[in-house]
Amino acid sequence: MSSSITSGFIDLATVDEIEKYMYGLPDDGVSMAHTLTYFVREFKKSTWFTQVPVPLSRSTGTSDFGQNWSVSISRAGDYLLQTWLRVTIPQVTLAATATPATLSLRWTRNLMHNLIREITISFNDLVGSRLDNYFLDMWSAFTTPASKRNGYDNMIGNISTLTDPVGPGGSLGHTGGTVLNLPISLFFTRDTGVSLPTAALPYNEIQLNFSMRDWKDLLILTDTAITTGNPYQTIDVSKHLGGVAPSLSNVQVWANYAIVSNVERKKMGCGVRDILIEQVQTAPRQNYTPSTNPMPSFDIRFSHAVKVLFFAVRNKTSAAEWSNYGTSSPVVSGTSVNYEPSGSFDPIATTTLIYENSNRLGTMGSDYYSLVSPWYHAPTIPSFIGYHMYSYSLNFFDLDPMGSTNYGKLTNVSIVPHASDAAVKASTGAGDGAGANYNQSYEFIVMAVNNNIVRISGGCLGFPVL
């Protein structure tokens, strides 16, 4: 092999009009003055700070399955950057005496998502933002990159020791429990530039409020001997769990704070500051019955500047299968679960978005909402069936305004999800393959992510535009 520095000068001698347009050239003093070089690094300086994660210790209520409880956000740190929920899921054993012997027990998918019925952040009595398990499903599906997906699944409970079914005498989880973590995707966690200036809010009692589901809504018991009917069974504590109901332990909410210099801290509360934030609005869930009404129309009543819509049809045949957005129910075989069996398809074929009797989007195929739209406007494309989005923004994950529609100025907005043939068949028990050969039931879910403005003034947080 050989190469010579001299040959590089030949490259430099090929300069022409295109190069003069693209580059600042040494003989052009005007363009050189406004041209960077890749060989002298310019550093962006910042104020002096540090960051530290701490557990939030002041809580009210019982932090357990099926309970509502709150934790107070400390103002000892200057800026709140991120928060996450850390819990220990107990080991659960299907009683050895449980009959029939073909019973199997497992935790639901996306366990940490579905443990949450709702999370809100409140400032005194003012709710600043809220999210639920459906948003957590959608947000993670469209924003979690493949390089972090495995780690995220480990955090939220998508691990074999929890989701692989066990028979009588078998146990889910480890002795002493399994530690899981849920990143809480509220507005201040999106970027340090919109972090919550807790030190500037001395007159607000800031709380994170949790509404959690009962364990009965998260554990799934099936009879694998039933292959042509509904295999889901009701869990009896005394019969199936040895009389011991599961209970969470070591429940903690952690917060990552930035601590700044005294000079910056003094300036934090000196003036009025407006922050552009993101909020989540979820419409009431609606029954979806493809066999009797394959083209239902649902009113969607949102407000503020909506940047993206997420929607899906949830398969609710098993009440505890919260994250199933396909036409079929999961199929249990031995110690494994096929969440998307061969007969499982997207329940939605096309979707129409209507503004006051005028089509905003007319019968657009689900390939657009599940593949094309996220390809251009989202960080990732979901690897699961049934996730849909429509973005008004060029990039909905970007904090800068890049497109939105003010739903507060619209009236009579509706969405029409046209059922797929697979959904029509599965709803009557005539679907193809296991998991769709008994009646499937569905509900429609739609939510919006909108922008709003919060104002920090006089030691309190408020909304100048409600």
From Swiss-Prot:
The UniProt record lists the keyword Transport: no
Segments passing through the bilayer: none
One protein family per Pfam: Capsid_NCLDV
GO molecular function, one term: structural molecule activity
GO cellular component: viral capsid
Xref: SUPFAM superfamilies: Group II dsDNA viruses VP
Compartment list: Virion
Keywords on record: Capsid protein, Late protein, Virion
KW Magnesium (keyword) present: no
Function in brief: Major capsid protein that self assembles to form an icosahedral capsid. Represents around 50% of the total virion protein mass.
Assembly notes: Homotrimer.
Protein family (similarity comment): Belongs to the NCLDV major capsid protein family.
Name listed for the protein in its UniProt record: Major capsid protein
Source organism of this protein record: Invertebrate iridescent virus 3
